[in-house]
Structure formats: structure tokens, C-alpha cells
Amino acid sequence: FNNRLSGALDVYYKKTKDLLNVIPIPAGSNFNSVILTNVGNVTNKGVEFSVNATPVRTGRVQWNLGFNVAYNDNTITNLTAVNDPSFPGTANANGIQINSVGYQINAFYVYKQLYDKSGKPIEGVFQDLNHDGVINQNDLYHYKSPAPRYIFGFSTDLTVDRWSLNAVLRANIGNYMYNGLQASAIQAGIMNPLGFLQNSLNDVLYTHFYNGQKLSDYYVQNASFLRMDNLGLGYDAGNFFHNKLGLRLNANVQNVFVITRYKGQDPELIGGSGVGIDNTVYPRPRTYSLGANLRF
């Protein structure tokens, strides 16, 4: 293809052993009932494909394209020193996620929310998954993961005479986010003891939750997205002063746009509570820049 088309395909399977995990130990064997030790095993398998092409290459015009896609599946295969099917897993510090054998890392561990006829969540009403007539921690279930199943990338670079235009886009498919800010939007939180209302997210007007429902899967939301990371425009003004100086001008925008169904600020933001937990108030900034490059 006259160096106009190239690509690569990789298939991988990786098993990681001896990861740290906190496990229970028999009474009297230590000064605590648990111990941090190397017992965790995780497998990662997937496929990566990339292709680069130059559809147009003439004296005045050159157009380069790049595309890549990756699929990954991670599964926890062991968390204990001995085989213990009754071991539920190790909960994360945020209380929303758990690591359990047979599931992805940082899977959400929540109650299954029930809804009324209009589709609105009912406060404090969850599905009794084990059918014992009581809603408790035994009704928590593994629901989705913050890790995307598919990751796409696309780049384009077009040059026409002295002008150039380039863009970079990314997409994550199959990743979920726990909307911690929405989970705190309750009516009890907007009532100040002094008698005036405080600010809250508008989701409180939809759910009408008075008390917190932080373990509801209602707040685990689809965070798949398409984002344009970068958009740039350049112009080469050429040489002047008897070819002693050259000038190139450029304009650039970062974080151009994002398309997503996620209801929070940003489907990629990572709060202080860990990956997949959104408790960040401030959105990711959009940056504009202008530049000039002098050549001597």
C-alpha cells in the first residue's frame, strides 16, 4: 500500500498472583481477627487492534487517520489462603464496592432498587433477593463495574498547503460510575436548623428522598462516553527576512466536548473515595491556547 496502511492485532491473557488482601484468621493466631497478606489472584484477558492509514497524499494535501480498539475482561480468581466459598469478598473503604471471587475488580455492591408505576425510585424499598422477608446485607448484590469493556481511540491529521487541522477522540463503553453527589441529594440535607433552605442537586426534586439511600443501585449509572480530547488548528506563515526567520501559528482546545448519558459532572472524574466513585463538585476545565513558533 505504499506505506499508506499499517496495523497491529494483539491477543493477551495475563494472570497476576499474590496480590495483597485482608482475610480473616483464626482467633488467637494474631493480635487481630484479620491479616493483610499476599493471596489475591486476578486474570486479565483481551484483544487490542490498531490501524493507521493515509487516505490522501498529494502535493498539496495529506490526510492521516488512526484508529484503535481494545477489549478487556478482568476477573478475580482467588482472595483467601484456603478455598472458602462462603467468603463474600473484601469491601472497599467507601462501602459501595467489593472485591469478590468471580467478579471484576471494584464491582459495586448495592441493593436492587424498586420503582413505582411511573418509574420513580421508592424510598427505602429494595428487592428481597434471598426471599427471607428481611432487607439486610444478605440482599446486597454485585452490580456492574467502573472498568470499561471496550476502549476506542480515533485521531485525524489533515494538512492542506500551509494549514493543518488535527483532532483526537476517545470512547469508553460499558463502564459505570457511582454518583455520590446525587446520593447526597436528600430533603433532610437542605433543611437548615436555623430555618432556611440550603443548596442541593436537582435530583432531590425527582426522587423526593428524605433520607439517604446510598446503597441503592439507582446511583450506579452508565458512564459510557465519547470525548474529544484535543482539537488543533495551525498555519505555517513561511519564511521571511530573506529566509532567516520562519513563523508558525497554532490554536488549540483541550476537553472540547463529551457525549454521555451519565448524570454527573464528568464520566471520568475520580473522587477521593476511589475509582468509580464520583463525589467531585468541580467539572474538568476546558482549555484554550494560542501559540506562535519562531524558527531562526
Where are these regions (language model features)?
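Membrane-embedded beta-strands that build the outer-membrane beta-barrel scaffold
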Residues: 5-13, 47-55, 63-71, 152-158, ...
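Flexible, solvent-exposed coil segments and beta strand-coil junctions
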Residues: 23-34, 89-90, 129-138, 206-217, ...
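Conserved small-residue
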Residues: 37-43, 54-146, 254-256, 261-264
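Outer-membrane beta-barrel and related beta-rich outer-membrane complex signature
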Residues: 19-23, 63, 71-94, 174-199, ...
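Outer-membrane beta-barrel transmembrane strand signature
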Residues: 6, 93, 97-168, 207-223, ...
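Outer-membrane beta-barrel signature, preferentially recognizing the C-terminal barrel domain
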Residues: 1-6, 34-58, 145-151, 279-288
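Membrane-embedded beta-barrel scaffold of Gram-negative outer-membrane proteins
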Residues: 1-30, 60-63, 70
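Extracytoplasmic gating/loop element in the C-terminal half of outer-membrane beta-barrel translocons
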Residues: 172-254, 267
